[in-house]
């Protein structure tokens, strides 16, 4: 059963947080009632009755009340604990209360931006983006044709007022110049683009968008958007391409927009769909699909590279561990190594035969000497001792 301190505001326990400092635990003086009363008074627990399994740690005693002998701290017989912290002092230090206060503050912080975003959404819900066109009106009769494009919904509270100036450049001088009136309405969930023009067989439209004060500070440069509409032979089909050129000369081509328009007169009118993305809007479906393709391609290339790296690592390990399994070595070189090994084996066999012959000759000599009584047991022991001492000195 682990020991722990019985004081109210003390969390010391044996085996925990005792690496930097030494803690010792002392039992209550149950047999000395006067001393026990002093302990309980200092602890502010007069009515409490401790048991023999409860202890106080050394943090509650002064150094004078401890007797150190052979590195062990013993409690003196007259020692009384005097160092105690009241629960009122530790109310501010309670971690559970601190955590609850932090949670309350976080909840308040979360509620405040939500309320602010709702208020800004209500205020900005009726704002619109207005487009002004500077085109000379020479012909009062206009044929209206409209096309609706739904851009992705921007985030709440980020609706902005942008001003667009359009300048038309007519290629066919024989026909009257066309007039273009556009209006952009952007809400949080809907987006529309309405165009009214005539005689746009082959025109180039240049849109210069100047950012207003409410636009994000990161988009400080102006952007030029060029839309080219080329009318085909088929009266019910137009091919439109749109390109954005930023001030940093980093153009990127939007997806080609193909639209089929019913009951369209080739000589008088054509339809163009212009998609103007908001700054904080979400990416379109085509860009999302292309991004997914890019990510999958990158993942495939990473997997292939990792596989190639694993194969290279495996070949390196094989080349290091098994010197005869290298792919760089030719067969001729391997056969040369095999022949060298065979020659070494034959040399070892010859040496073995020579040593065996010498041993047999020595055994024959010893037998002959024993038969002729040239060697007695004493002489044999002397010779054996001589050989053993010689071997020891050699070792």
From Swiss-Prot:
Has sequence-specific DNA-binding activity and can function as transcriptional repressor (in vitro). May be a regulator of cell cycle: THAP5 overexpression in human cell lines causes cell cycle arrest at G2/M phase. One of its GO terms (biological process) is negative regulation of transcription by RNA polymerase II. One of its GO terms (cellular component) is nucleus. Cleaved by HTRA2 during apoptosis. Pfam families: THAP. This is THAP domain-containing protein 5. Keywords: Cell cycle, Coiled coil, DNA-binding, Metal-binding, Nucleus, Repressor, Transcription, Transcription regulation, Zinc, Zinc-finger. It is found in: Nucleus. Residues 348-382 form a coiled coil. Induction: Up-regulated both in response to UV light treatment and cisplatin, agents that cause DNA damage (at protein level).
């Amino acid at each position: 059963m682990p020991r722990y301190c019985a004081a109210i505001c003390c969390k010391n326990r044996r085996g925990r947080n005792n690496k930097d400092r030494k803690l010792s635990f002392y039992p209550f003086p149950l047999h000395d009632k006067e001393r026990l009363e002093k302990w309980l008074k200092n602890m502010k627990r007069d009515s409490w009755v401790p048991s023999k399994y409860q202890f106080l740690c050394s943090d509650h005693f002064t150094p004078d009340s401890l007797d150190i002998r052979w590195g062990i701290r013993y409690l003196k017989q007259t020692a009384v604990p005097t160092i105690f912290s009241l629960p009122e002092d530790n109310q501010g230090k309670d971690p559970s209360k601190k955590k609850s206060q932090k949670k309350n503050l976080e909840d308040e912080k979360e509620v405040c931006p939500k309320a602010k975003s709702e208020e800004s959404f209500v205020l900005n819900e009726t704002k619109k983006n207005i487009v002004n066109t500077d085109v000379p009106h020479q012909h009062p009769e206009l044929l209206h044709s409209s096309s609706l494009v739904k851009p992705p919904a921007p985030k709440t509270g980020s609706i902005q007022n942008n001003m667009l100036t359009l300048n038309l450049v007519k290629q066919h001088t024989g026909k009257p110049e066309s007039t273009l009136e556009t209006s952009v309405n952007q809400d949080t969930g809907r987006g529309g683009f309405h165009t009214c023009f005539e005689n746009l067989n082959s025109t180039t439209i240049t849109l210069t968008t100047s950012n207003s004060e409410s636009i994000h500070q990161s988009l400080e440069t102006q952007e030029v958007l060029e839309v080219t509409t080329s009318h085909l032979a088929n009266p019910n089909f137009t091919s439109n391409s749109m390109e954005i050129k930023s001030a940093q000369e980093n153009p990127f081509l939007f997806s080609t927009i193909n639209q089929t328009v019913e009951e369209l007169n080739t000589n008088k009118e054509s339809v163009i769909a212009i998609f103007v993305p908001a700054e904080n809007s979400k990416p379109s479906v085509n860009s999302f699909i292309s991004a997914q393709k890019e990510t999958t391609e990158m993942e495939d290339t990473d997997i292939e590279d990792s596989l190639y790296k694993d194969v290279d690592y495996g070949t390196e390990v094989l080349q290091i561990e098994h010197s005869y399994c290298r792919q760089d070595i030719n067969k001729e070189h391997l056969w040369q190594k095999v022949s060298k090994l065979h020659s070494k084996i034959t040399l070892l066999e010859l040496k073995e035969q020579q040593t065996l012959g010498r041993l047999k000759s020595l055994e024959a000599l010893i037998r002959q000497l024993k038969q002729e009584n040239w060697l007695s047991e004493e002489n044999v022991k002397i010779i054996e001792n001589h050989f053993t001492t010689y071997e020891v000195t050699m070792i």
